[in-house]
Regions:
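Walker A/P-loop phosphate-binding motif and the immediately C-terminal alpha-helix
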Residues: 27-64
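Nucleotide-state-sensitive switch-loop elements of NTP-binding domains
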Residues: 26-29, 52, 65-148, 152-153
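Conserved beta-strand scaffold positions in the cores of enzyme catalytic domains, especially
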Residues: 28, 59, 104-106, 229-232
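Conserved catalytic-core segment of NTP-binding enzymes
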Residues: 132, 136-138, 143, 148-232, ...
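C-terminal lobe/tail of nucleotide-utilizing enzymes
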Residues: 1-4, 18-21, 192-346
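Residue-level signature of catalytic and energy-coupling elements of molecular machines
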Residues: 35, 107, 126, 147, ...
Length: 346
């Protein structure tokens, strides 16, 4: 939960002490992750969970796919900042800010038309427009979540880090190498701009971490890069079901275990004051680290635990069905017939 400095305690006429979360100032949090890793799912559920705590939340999707806030709005897409600007009409605040689940304010930066321009430019333009229109002063959000594509940390995608738009940065990652590779690149960007007012790192959100071996890999990567794990989020069919309905888990399955995972994560983010510079691995170090884990996994590839690991990656909760040894066939014994002896000739 938030520190006591973030709470206000008061006593109304009923004579009982009450407490509510009060943000001293707007919290700006950037959540990065490679495409398809679950950063938008995570961001939207965090936003929904924070809104349950009575906070005013704004989520800004910084991905050309423009689907960051879909599950906060029953699966519906909203006009993006770049689409609104391309229309040629004067852009009003109501054109780019749309209310979602439980009052969460939704914004999508958008991207260029296919084959034209720079995708990162949408983020630059969106943030500039929001500042010009004094959107943050008008709506006074307690928390702003920037959901940012993390495959590359360049140009517009690096703005939340480079210009200190966000005070804290998280990355969503699994134990897959390419997800960790993207996280390592993010760490390089944070380190590069740390001494010039850039955002600092606050933790890895380990997604799809159902098995001990998956956690071990992410934990070892965190130790190798001098970072920390903010929370583990298991893979769950509950997420899939809710997203097919166009909802977050917080809205679609509020009493589920998965919803509680997101609530715990949201509270941890709210109370987390850690801000530090990671120690990214260089190319050779990352290669050596990956090869060491490859050797470990190959050593145990024939074990039942490894088979279960492979199945779990496809079907959470699956159990390996090991082939039973076939019973040995006993060779058939041919019946022997007594030889007839030739009769002696008289």
């Amino acid at each position: 939960m938030p520190n006591i400095a973030d709470c206000r305690v008061y006593m109304p006429l009923d004579g009982r002490l009450h407490a509510e979360i009060v943000m001293a100032k707007q919290r700006n949090i950037a959540i990065y992750g490679k495409g398809g890793i679950g950063k938008s799912t995570t961001s939207s559920n965090i936003s929904a969970a924070l809104s349950e705590l009575g906070l005013k939340v704004m989520q800004i999707g910084c991905d050309p796919k423009s689907d960051s806030t879909n599950t906060l709005r029953k699966g519906r897409f909203i006009p993006t900042v770049l689409d609104s600007l391309r229309s040629g009409k004067r852009v009003e605040t109501k054109d780019i800010i749309h209310e979602g689940f439980n009052g969460v304010l939704c914004v999508e930066a958008g991207g260029p038309e296919p084959g034209v321009g720079c995708a990162g430019r949408g983020i630059i333009t969106a943030i500039e427009l929001l500042r010009q229109r004094k959107v943050f002063e008008e709506f006074k959000p307690d928390v702003v979540i920037y959901d940012v594509l993390g495959d590359v940390v360049c140009g517009g995608f690096g703005i939340p880090i480079r210009e200190g738009v966000a005070e804290q940065v998280y990355t969503v990652s699994s134990s897959d190498f390419m997800a960790l590779y993207a996280a390592n690149n993010l760490f390089k960007g944070i380190k590069k701009y740390a001494n010039s007012g850039g955002a600092l790192f606050s933790g890895i959100i380990a997604n799809s971490s159902n098995l001990p071996i998956q956690r071990e890999i992410v934990e070892d990567f965190a130790a190798s890069t001098k970072t920390t794990i903010a929370e583990y989020v298991p893979r769950s069919l509950t997420v899939t079901k809710c997203e097919l309905q166009g909802k977050t888990v917080i809205e679609g399955a509020p009493d589920s275990e998965q919803a509680d995972v997101y609530r715990i994560l949201a509270k941890k983010i709210l109370s987390n004051k850690d801000r530090y510079v990671p120690a990214p691995l260089d190319t050779d170090q990352l290669k050596d680290w990956a090869e060491s884990w490859s050797d470990k996994l190959l050593e145990g590839r024939d074990s039942p635990a490894h088979v279960k690991c492979e199945l779990e990656c496809i079907i959470p909760g699956a159990e390996p069905i090991l082939a039973k040894p076939r019973p040995q066939k006993t060779p058939a014994v041919k019946a022997t017939t007594p030889r007839r002896t030739a009769k002696a000739k008289g």
